[in-house]
Amino acid sequence: MRWTRRLRLCAVGAVVASAVFSPSAARAAEPSANRLTGLVNPFIGTQNDGNTFPGAAVPFGMVQFSPDTGHNTGYDYTQKRIRGFSLVHLSGVGCAIGGDLPVLPTTGDVTETDDAKYAATFSHAHEQASPGYYRVGLDSGIRAELTATQRTAVQRYTFPATRKANVLLNAGQSLHKNVSSKVEILDDRTVRTEITGSGFCGPSRPYTVYTVTRFRRPFTAHGTWYQNSITRGATRSSGPGRNGAYVTFDTTKDRTVEATTGLSYVDAQGAAVNLRAAHVSSFDQPREAARRAWEERLGHVRVRGGNAILRTTFYSSLYRSFLAPNIGSDADGRYTGWDQRIHRATDFTYYQNWSLWDTYRTQCQLLSLLAPREARDMAISVLKIDEEGGWLPKWGYGTIETNVMSGDPVTPFLTHAYQQGLLKGYEERAYRALKKNADGVPPADTMYVGREANREYIANGFAPYIKDRPFSKPGDSDYHHGGSVTLEYALSDGMLAQMAGSLGHVADAARYAARSRNYRTILDPSTGFFRARDASGAFVGPADPARSEGFHEGTAWQYQWLVPQDLRGMVALIGGERAANNRLDSFFAYDRLLKDPARTAREVWVNGPYAYYNADKYNPQNEPDLTAPYTYLSTGQPWKTTDVVHAALTLYTDGPTGVTGNDDLGTMSAWNVLSSIGIFPVQPGYPTWGLTTPVFDRVDLVLDRAYYPRGGLTITAPGTSHTRRYIQGVRVQGTAYEHTYVTTDTLRRLGSLEFTVGARPSGWGTAPEAAPPALVAEQSAGK
């Protein structure tokens, strides 16, 4: 997502891995026997704009305590200076956000106030990370260690023997724009800050975070700064610009300094509440608790088979899938709603940070499978945004809407939650919010864009592409992406039609089903491809679908498969299965792929930095194509899905460049996890899971019995490998199964899903009735 996406380097993964994990490189913590956390490498994705972070967090925690090296999203593996360890990071986003309160240990006199000037040099040889823990030896001789609880950042610094061991707390510099800040030294152990920031991929409304930092022992000196002016002994500084504080310790006898920082999006009281609730008695206590939390979370999936690199990339992806959304409510249940008022969550945990254009396609499905209780609270939190703030979100950060990206991603996010049974007791409330969103446009005086082009879409059947239309609000504009927005709106309408019908809203269901076929309105009969239309209805932009305009971060070639609500109808529209398969083969460079899958993935699919446009090939690094490999399940050639998926999986490696593009809050990581275990959500917003060959001999899923009564699912594919990857047959609970998909209802009844694999394609799944059903089949049949 966004302009900073980088493409993977074309080096062979094994060579990259060998270089990265040489003794001179940063490393994941040494694996311990039977510990899944030892298989996670947090440095994966920290180079080439995967934009992940290597620091400390617990699953879905409010705090992500991690080093910032000067990269716009925090940490870049190629940079060698740390500006500070800050509290907030979003894994894999494409624009600067967070980075609040960078802290840094130093020695000597405090003479600089700009983190770019006082940044500490370091070497990857002295850097180590594992889930919930980060350590680095700075060239200054200071060792910094970080860990985290749900709402606190815990730090331990080991200094040389000196009377001038400092900790700098920089309230006035963040990754995003810092609007104003305040720092207060309350006593000889405590520092409090208030930080207001704004901006994510452009301007946004401001938001405020509050922190309280408590040191385990008193400091011997202190001071504050404003801009370039340092005032020794001062206890307060505030206003726009750089504000910060430093505290000094004598480490001639005790070289260790420990501190815990409570974070809140509510107020200073909330930060103090969160600090007390963490009950941190020593650094090692929360470090071990974080490790146990991750061990338990990762233990929901256990795999057998595969080599060491495959297991590392898999569990590292699983780890990143659990980093967001993030807890937004304090330990006392209070949270700041999108009306900027304080509310209290009494029977759920409030979550925030919604990269919905990305996560609705993979990550929310993975969480509904492996973390349904948290996923339920996340869905309820999204409903609270509507109830308190007035509209459903598009891309929410903290307490604000950023309006980043386009379309209507919240609808498939919530309809999926409904179909998974996560909204029991909230069904009609969710439907009312979704109906309002689907049929309207947010008022002009609100911060929401919503379905901005909805009036034209409902009236004419398509969202117009108006290239130079002025922005009505901060963020992206749906009018600037009319082609892809039409497809996204239609997808959402199809998913909402299923929910409406299930709830008995028959007329609404028919209306949304009819609208879900609006993808047809932008099919240019002269080219046979989708093409944006202007306000008058004329097709606009180059006729060449590889050079199309009006498609967000993609081309008409890449968006043509984004019709999960009626893929059969789409296939018929372009000439039937044979024509569709010819297009798919060209799209994936299938003949070349068979000869050299990894090279095709890196040299044909991946074309260079910012390669969103001017392409007629599959882009495995961006969201519009995430379901595209699974299209073959609906065209009678399911074995080709396995060929493409397994080739795409070679792009995930165990080094810093090992994430395919921005990870986007776990979206690309979740794609890896789901594709690796052989079940993938092919109709985002509806509980349909496509089947493909797992890369492991056996996968054991531990499932929540409240949602999956059997409490687990075992997926087997004995002998699966690069050469034996084709499905010969599937058995469900021991019974032969010919469909290329299963539903969530089927998964709830399953204890086992068995794949038999071989060296050549078979006839499995090739019958027309084996394909996933079109969700609007009856309505589309007569059109």
What residue ranges belong to the model's regions?
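Accessory carbohydrate-recognition regions in carbohydrate-active enzymes
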Residues: 30-412, 418-487, 495-521, 527, ...
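Secretory targeting and sorting signals
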Residues: 1-29
